[in-house]
Regions:
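Short, structured secondary-structure boundary patches
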Residues: 39-44, 136-137
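Exposed alpha-helical structural elements
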Residues: 4-8, 29, 44, 66-67, ...
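Structural signature of alpha-solenoid helical repeat scaffolds
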Residues: 37, 74, 78, 107-110, ...
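Structural detector for internal amphipathic alpha-helices that build alpha-solenoid repeat scaffolds
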Residues: 17-20, 42-58, 76, 80-95, ...
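Amphipathic alpha-helical scaffolding segments comprising HEAT/armadillo-like alpha-solenoid repeats
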Residues: 24-31, 55-74, 93-106, 124-136, ...
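Eukaryotic acidic, Ser/Thr-rich intrinsically disordered low-complexity regions
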Residues: 2-5, 133-171
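Residues that form generic nucleotide/phosphate-binding pockets
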Residues: 8-12, 33, 48, 70, ...
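Amphipathic alpha-helical packing elements
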Residues: 1-36
């Protein structure tokens, strides 16, 4: 899988275009490599997981989120990705297949603070908003932190302030 993807990267570089993101099949192969990483490929595997799998609701994102979710629950282990790191990576997926796993992490004291940070900056919640709300109403302090963060608009206010002047060209 790694050699084939490296060949793909080289072919695209010759054309002056970036490589395509990993497909669901390539992501599944990557997951297997992450479970038993070949020596010397550790940083490449992590880079592919973090940066070459599409976020959101792509099938590759489903494979990625399922793998990371399984790490957070302890069903799967990887010497390269701890449960906290898995939660952090889930938080970079913007919304979609990662949401259910992040909400579940609110019930795990070891992962909840990381999940709060991730969910506080995630807007694409759809109906899962109600799951967080329900947890907060049932006394989950971490879910309450997420709700308070959303109410305060931290997803917006935590971003870098815009420049005083922005020059644009409109056609």
């Amino acid at each position: 899988m790694l050699e084939a993807y490296r060949t793909h990267i080289a072919e695209r570089a010759i054309q002056g275009i970036p490589p395509e993101p990993l497909s669901a099949e390539q992501t599944a192969d990557l997951v297997e490599l992450l479970k038993n990483p070949p020596t010397g490929e550790e940083s490449t595997l992590i880079d592919l997981l973090r940066n070459r799998v599409p976020a959101g609701v792509d099938q590759a994102a489903y494979v990625k989120a399922s793998f990371l979710s399984a790490i957070t629950t302890g069903d799967v282990t990887s010497s390269l990705v701890s449960p906290v790191e898995a939660t952090e990576i889930l938080g970079t997926m913007l919304g979609g297949y990662n949401i259910e796993a992040l909400i579940a992490c609110l019930d795990n004291d070891d992962l909840a603070a990381t999940a709060v940070t991730a969910l506080s900056h995630t807007l694409l919640m759809f109906d899962a908003f109600h799951d967080v709300d329900e947890k907060a109403k049932n006394g989950n302090a971490y879910a309450m932190q997420v709700m308070q963060s959303w109410a305060a608009g931290e997803w917006f206010t935590s971003r870098k302030q815009l420049e005083d002047k922005i020059t644009l060209t409109v056609f």
